[in-house]
């Protein structure tokens, strides 16, 4: 598998874009917890070694890379809570998290590289959507690392408050054990009621 590179950013810099943010989100698929996004502006001279798509990196290495990025890059994190997911739908909530991540950067970017084919409306800057961008752009890969680490920490904290669902390991995703716990324990305040498996339990649909 090819690794992410810095060519998109280099080409854009040659066209005059100086603050290029990679943007990625995590948490569209879980039954519980927020959807989160990160925006990262890399320093071309201080890119952490081994930076890669979060799915290709161990949890321990993700933590180390996120700590490095906090020191050498500009980082913003955005969250859309469960109530917003249920009110807006997951796509719009993910876009809201992306906008909040961009807004959380220390200074506004002039270009955003966004993972996927879809991009939010009302972006504060120019943008390119890149399919499988976390495997192609180092800036997006950095955002995928930051977002994943941030959300895993949130879900671990929620797991301590609401034990039994296994969120510390499944991060809210619909594993067999998580689905079984939903039936056994019931629906928590952090479950997404608009998602069918949760909705069906609440309304006893079979």
Swiss-Prot record:
Pfam families: RNase_HII (PF01351). Belongs to the RNase HII family. It catalyses: Endonucleolytic cleavage to 5'-phosphomonoester. Gene3D superfamilies: Ribonuclease H-like superfamily/Ribonuclease H. Its cofactor is Mn(2+); Mg(2+). A divalent metal cation binds at residues 24-25, 115. Its EC number is 3.1.26.4. GO terms for biological process: DNA replication, removal of RNA primer; mismatch repair. HAMAP family: RNase_HII_B (MF_00052_B). PANTHER family: RIBONUCLEASE H2 SUBUNIT A, RIBONUCLEASE HII. GO terms for molecular function: manganese ion binding; RNA binding; RNA-DNA hybrid ribonuclease activity. Residues 18-206 form the RNase H type-2 domain. GO terms for cellular component: cytoplasm; ribonuclease H2 complex. Manganese or magnesium. Binds 1 divalent metal ion per monomer in the absence of substrate. May bind a second metal ion after substrate binding. It comes from the Bacteria. Keywords: Cytoplasm, Endonuclease, Hydrolase, Manganese, Metal-binding, Nuclease. Endonuclease that specifically degrades the RNA of RNA-DNA hybrids. It is found in: Cytoplasm. InterPro entries: RNase_HII, RNase_HII/HIII, RNase_HII/HIII_dom, RNaseH-like_sf, RNaseH_sf. This is Ribonuclease HII. Its main location: cytoplasm.
């Amino acid at each position: 598998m090819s690794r992410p590179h810095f060519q998109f950013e280099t080409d854009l810099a040659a066209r005059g874009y100086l603050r290029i943010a990679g943007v990625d989100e995590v948490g569209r698929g879980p039954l519980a917890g927020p959807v989160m996004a990160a925006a990262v502006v890399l320093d071309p001279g201080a890119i952490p070694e081994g930076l890669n798509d979060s799915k290709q990196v161990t949890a321990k290495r993700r933590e180390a890379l996120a700590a490095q990025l906090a020191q050498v890059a500009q980082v913003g994190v955005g969250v859309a809570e469960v109530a917003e997911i249920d009110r807006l739908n997951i796509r719009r909530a993910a876009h809201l998290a992306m906008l909040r991540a961009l807004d959380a950067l220390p200074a506004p970017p002039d270009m955003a590289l966004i993972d996927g084919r879809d991009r939010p409306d009302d972006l504060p800057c120019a943008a390119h959507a890149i399919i499988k961008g976390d495997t192609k752009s180092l800036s997006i890969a950095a955002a995928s690392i930051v977002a994943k680490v941030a959300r895993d920490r949130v879900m671990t904290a929620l797991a301590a408050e609401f034990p039994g669902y296994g969120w510390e390991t499944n991060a809210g995703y619909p594993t067999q054990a998580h689905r079984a716990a939903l039936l056994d324990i019931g629906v928590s305040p952090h479950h997404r009621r608009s998602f069918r498996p949760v909705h069906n339990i609440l309304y006893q649909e079979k």
